[in-house]
A protein has these predicted regions:
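Conserved NTP-handling cores and scaffolds of large molecular machines
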Residues: 83-87, 115, 136, 140-144
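Generic amphipathic alpha-helical segments used as scaffolds and interaction surfaces in large
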Residues: 35-39, 119-123, 144
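Charged alpha-helix within mobile-element recombinases
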Residues: 110-116, 122-138
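Acidic two-metal-ion nuclease catalytic site recognized across multiple nuclease folds
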Residues: 134-157
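Mg2+-dependent endonuclease catalytic cores in nucleic-acid-processing enzymes, primarily RNase H-like
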Residues: 1-114
Length: 157
């Protein structure tokens, strides 16, 4: 279950930028007590993952985004399928669209602007709100893979 999906920019100079990122993540962790926080860890964001997980003790897991972003089974296209299956409910009232950050309007706008090219890949920039939701989806997918699956066999002689 996704409780909160955040995307945005944190402004600070030099070392303050990293500290501001970790402080922001700590505040969200205190508010929601998540079992896992999935963060895109391409480039410099790897340092954020390390600082939040190893130094601040937050349940942060990094994901290095690659070609799987375009795949229908684990990529951003999976979000469309989950929405068709009614596994997502996006709040849409004045309070939700105006009072939240980044706001449900940005998420809906981002999802509606996704364009798939003839090669079956996303074209152009993927909006931050959509990437944040995909990070949530990846965390859920990873949790389901790690759960113990077993089959019960009944044998009648």
């Amino acid at each position: 279950r996704v409780l909160y999906s955040w995307s945005g920019k944190i402004y600070a100079k030099g070392q303050g930028w990293l500290e501001a990122q970790v402080v922001s993540m700590k505040e969200l962790a205190e508010r929601f007590n998540p079992s896992k926080v999935m963060v895109e860890s391409n480039g410099y964001q790897r340092l954020v993952v390390h600082a939040a997980a190893d130094l601040a003790g937050l349940p942060v897991v990094g994901h290095n985004t690659g070609r799987e972003k375009h795949r229908h089974d684990v990529g951003i296209p999976l979000i469309a399928l989950k929405m068709e299956q009614e596994k997502y409910a996006i709040p849409w009232n004045k309070e939700a669209t105006e009072g939240s950050r980044p706001g449900t309007r940005k998420l809906v706008d981002g999802l509606s602007r996704l364009i798939y090219g003839k090669n079956g890949r996303l074209e152009g920039h993927t909006p931050d709100a959509v990437m944040a939701l995909w990070m949530c989806e990846l965390a859920i997918h990873e949790d389901h893979k790690q759960k113990l699956n077993y089959t019960k066999w009944d044998y009648f002689a």
